[in-house]
Amino acid sequence: MTTLSPDAFAGHTPMMQQYLRIKADHPDTLVFYRMGDFYELFFEDAAKAARLLDLTLTQRGASAGTPIKMAGVPHHAVEQYLAKLVKMGESVAICEQIGDPATSKGPVERKVVRVVTPGTLTDAALLSDKNDVYLLAMCTGHNKRGVAVNIGLAWLNLASGALRLAEIEPDQLAAALERIRPAEILTPDGATDAVPAGAGASKRVPAWHFDIASGTQRLCDQLDVASLDGFGAHSLTSACGAAGALLLYAAATQGQQLRHVRSLKVENETEYIGLDPATRRNLELTETLRGTESPTLYSLLDTCCTTMGSRLLRHWLHHPPRASVAAQSRQQAIGALLDAPANASLDALRSALRQIADVERITGRLALLSARPRDLSSLRDTFAALPALRERISAIVANADSLTRVDAALAPPAECLDLLTSAIAPEPAAMVRDGGVIARGYDAELDELRDISENCGQFLIDLEARERTRTGIANLRVEYNKVHGFYIEVTRGQTDKVPDDYRRRQTLKNAERYITPELKTFEDKALSAQERALARERALYDAVLQALLPFIPECQRVASALAELDLLAAFAERASALDWVAPTFTDEIGIEIEQGRHPVVEAQVEQFIANDCRFGTERKLLLITGPNMGGKSTFMRQTALIALMAYVGSYVPAKSACFGPIDRIFTRIGAADDLAGGRSTFMVEMTEAAAILNDATPQSLVLMDEIGRGTSTFDGLALAWAIARHLLAHNACYTLFATHYFELTQLPAEFPQAANVHLSAVEHGHGIVFLHAVNEGPANQSYGLQVAQLAGVPAPVIRAARKHLAYLEQQSASQHTPQLDLFSAPPVAADDLECADAPALPDTPHPALEKLRDIDPDDLKPREALDLLYELRTLVRSHDADGHA
């Protein structure tokens, strides 16, 4: 806690002194200071919040001679403002009133109950249902000479309690952050290591928080173990320092222990297939190149019935295991689900899963004592549904070990379910303060207080009837309002009949309101009962939360099993709906894909042309040639995606597929200037190529698309040739090498492990039709001018390009020209100049095309469609007979 000198408070009111003390402990955080029904911000916090949230900035009086800037948000809508702020990378300290205004002398006691930061979100209103939020700490390890030898990473999903550690090489930091995607990154004060731009909100914390010895002990205390050997973390150093800082920070933001952080996973780079940032981006696993969430592999696969399954899918896609045994186990489960008997059908299972709540995040809030009443009722209803869900699984588990494990983990925690059933009302209110949360019969005292409060109506009816009889006033009424409480209302003309025991409470224009000793006694009892009932309910609810804490490990077990079951069922649904097959695996070097299809592109088009892809010890590099837009990049990406899907455990879009070991997937596809990093397009391209040449192994899958195109023709050709040779001679990796340098098609003559394949197309006049079929052998041309014409390049430009192309081809045939002169003018005849504006292609339309343009297929009857087909055939034959191409 920060200590301020007495001078700092001179001239300030007691309330502002209280605020300044709290603000001093959170100097870099916006303080939401509770005042009645609002959270107020003061001074510079108010100005900043007004700017970020579009709030009204006011100024009320002064404190110590300084005008007090103010801005506020209503407490019932605070979550929407918090969501906006954390998206902007801001942190907010929530300062609540914890004292009773009625008994407080001076300012009501307040304290910060939690700090909301981008990486420590747990409230459902602040979280995306299908995205995990990670808080990450990084600590650099140095040798005795002060040279950085590794970077220790610790990252925590506070909403679920999942904690992971890793130690990586310094040059792997960008790839690790791209994979983890942390929302907030903790680094030591004074550290010189720069966090890559766009990696996440960065927060500096005291360097001593990263002490390795203290961090190791803090980890042991958190996990309640004597040593970390059982977690495989015995050799970690800097990662333990990072974990210590992370746990300290997370606990401080929550203001309490992290009871649900009870396990640890140490990640090793050899455990998963390596995917660098460029590969994740180019394969569009969870985000398109345009930055949208769809269409991606994730959006295609995500038919999960629970949000837990959707989040697990995202994790699996970014963490494909290298060991095929994990994939085979998952695919075995998918097969069992597809072959399930009628009483345990996949549709019935998925229908049951749709009723399941987000147990994972509810458990996290339960551990932090922030679970709301409907969290608990959802948890109860989910646990109550587990026996029926297990019955559906029981008919399947004999065929799949992983389903057997999931089934066992879905055993509902009986004591936890009993407590939730007895304590929580069937349909509780959203907030405890509203009452109606604790079930009737759970607490006798609460039931009695509720009876008093809820029976007010009958008492008032009886009292009104008695008083009408006693006084003879037929229109006498007994009523209640929040300002004056209970009262007896008598119209002005009947006041002479009022008995002596009536005491005037309020005078109105046309009536008088009275109170009697009997009504006053009842009022005190009723209002007191209501207040006491709410207080009792709050105390009981807090006690229920405490009583549920021992069941957190069981809740986490159930959540994990539900997520896995849901994801496996989603994989089975995709396999059935999209005609996918189970891949096989071998220990031999090779990849065999028969009639493979790009899963995402196939879903976007009416017809997709399937293609084969084959690698082996004698076939390691495929030189892919063919026209632009012919499908080279699609073919390359589909090969990588099918391989990744296989190792994730999904079925794959192919007739059959078999994979040998794969350790990494690299892609060098497309590029753009890195303006922030000061790198040109070509520099980005060469940097990615260098990483591949340095790191690819015989078990790596490499996608190289048009390497060398960012420089001069001969430089690019020379680089492409040398890179292809290196990949064959030194890396010996599986390589898909797309190029427009037709000189490279001679490479198989030198390296038998290289093979030529091409994407086919056919010309029609000066037009082109892409067949998207992969065939053996090299292509004969690139059809670049035809593609340019399809793109809408003006006809005069196309004509000029054809002439210049002929000249360049003639020039390149000369053995005396070391480099093509792209800017020398070819000889052009005068008559050619005169017709430079002529159209590049004949503009006579084909009669069949004209006929097709006038047709609305939706208006055709079956017989009309058949007649039209014959008519179109006649037009085509007639047109060809007239000598047209």
From Swiss-Prot:
Q: What is this protein called?
A: DNA mismatch repair protein MutS
State the Gene3D superfamilies in the record.
Answer: 1.10.1420.10, 6.10.140.430, DNA repair protein MutS, domain I, MutS, connector domain, P-loop containing nucleotide triphosphate hydrolases
Q: Sorted alphabetically, which keywords does the UniProt record give?
A: ATP-binding, DNA damage, DNA repair, DNA-binding, Nucleotide-binding
Q: What does this protein do?
A: This protein is involved in the repair of mismatches in DNA. It is possible that it carries out the mismatch recognition step. This protein has a weak ATPase activity.
> Which terms in the Gene Ontology molecular function aspect does this entry carry?
ATP binding; ATP-dependent DNA damage sensor activity; damaged DNA binding; mismatched DNA binding
A GO CC term?
Answer: cytosol
Q: Does the keyword Cytoplasm apply?
A: no
* CDD domains listed in its UniProt record: ABC_MutS1 (cd03284)
Q: Which organism is it from?
A: Burkholderia lata (strain ATCC 17760 / DSM 23089 / LMG 22485 / NCIMB 9086 / R18194 / 383)
Which GO biological-process labels does this protein carry? mismatch repair
Q: Where does ATP bind?
A: G626, P627, N628, M629, G630, G631, K632, S633
| HAMAP family for the chain | MutS
Which family is this sequence assigned to? Answer: Belongs to the DNA mismatch repair MutS family.
Q: Which PANTHER family match?
A: DNA MISMATCH REPAIR PROTEIN MSH1, MITOCHONDRIAL, DNA MISMATCH REPAIR PROTEIN MUTS FAMILY MEMBER
List where the protein spans the membrane. none
